[in-house]
Amino acid sequence: MSYIPYVVEQTGRGERSYDIYSRLLKDRIIMLSGEVNDQVASSIVAQLLFLEAQDPDKDIYFYINSPGGVITSGLSMFDTMNYIKPDIVTICIGQAASMGAFLLASGTKGKRYALPHARIMIHQPSGGAQGQSTDIQIQAQEIQRLKDTLNEIMAEKTGKTAKRIEKDTERDNFMSAKEAVEYGLIDKVLTKSFT
């Protein structure tokens, strides 16, 4: 069981208690902590849509500390980030690996950050298949299609060619925050809060 802190605020009508994530959401801050899966993606997508409905002209701050996870779950967040009007400020705290790195790079250009000791890792998609040989072939083709899609998007986000992305993601490719700036995954290393 994970522990979720609560904060208490004084209002004109007394005290109000929030879990920390609800309180952060009030300030347009969304947290991705842990593995990317359908349940996490649904929660993040709902928060993005809620914040756009509240104010489509204000930035949304998306903090990422994730080892990655399910590609299609990550793509649902990516598509929503691009679908809504507000700029998405991405900030890596801890690590952004695999789909976490993809989401980090998918923030609004000029507003993609990492803290000084954050680690970013990119690599090719992985997956497994079982069943009849034709089913395995279908799954392999789907993984290849997803790989090509991710490489094209990462190329656009980093300014690299899709061929270069394919080469650089052949194996796990770890970077410091500074190296991620040089690679084009993020725009700046943050040393002080800007909110």
From Swiss-Prot:
GO terms for molecular function: ATP-dependent peptidase activity; ATPase binding; serine-type endopeptidase activity. Transmembrane segments: none annotated. It holds the Pfam family CLP_protease. The active site is at S98 (nucleophile), H123. GO terms for biological process: protein quality control for misfolded or incompletely synthesized proteins. Disulfide bonds: none annotated. Its EC number is 3.4.21.92. It catalyses: Hydrolysis of proteins to small peptides in the presence of ATP and magnesium. alpha-casein is the usual test substrate. In the absence of ATP, only oligopeptides shorter than five residues are hydrolyzed (such as succinyl-Leu-Tyr-|-NHMec, and Leu-Tyr-Leu-|-Tyr-Trp, in which cleavage of the -Tyr-|-Leu- and -Tyr-|-Trp bonds also occurs). CDD domains: S14_ClpP_2 (cd07017). Coiled coil: none annotated. Keywords: Cytoplasm, Hydrolase, Protease, Serine protease. It is found in: Cytoplasm. One of its GO terms (cellular component) is cytoplasm. Belongs to the peptidase S14 family. Fourteen ClpP subunits assemble into 2 heptameric rings which stack back to back to give a disk-like structure with a central cavity, resembling the structure of eukaryotic proteasomes. NCBIfam families: clpP (TIGR00493), PRK00277.1 (NF001368), PRK12553.1 (NF009205). Cleaves peptides in various proteins in a process that requires ATP hydrolysis. Has a chymotrypsin-like activity. Plays a major role in the degradation of misfolded proteins. This is ATP-dependent Clp protease proteolytic subunit. It comes from Sulfurovum sp. (strain NBC37-1). The lineage of its organism: Bacteria, Pseudomonadati, Campylobacterota, Epsilonproteobacteria, Campylobacterales. The gene is clpP.
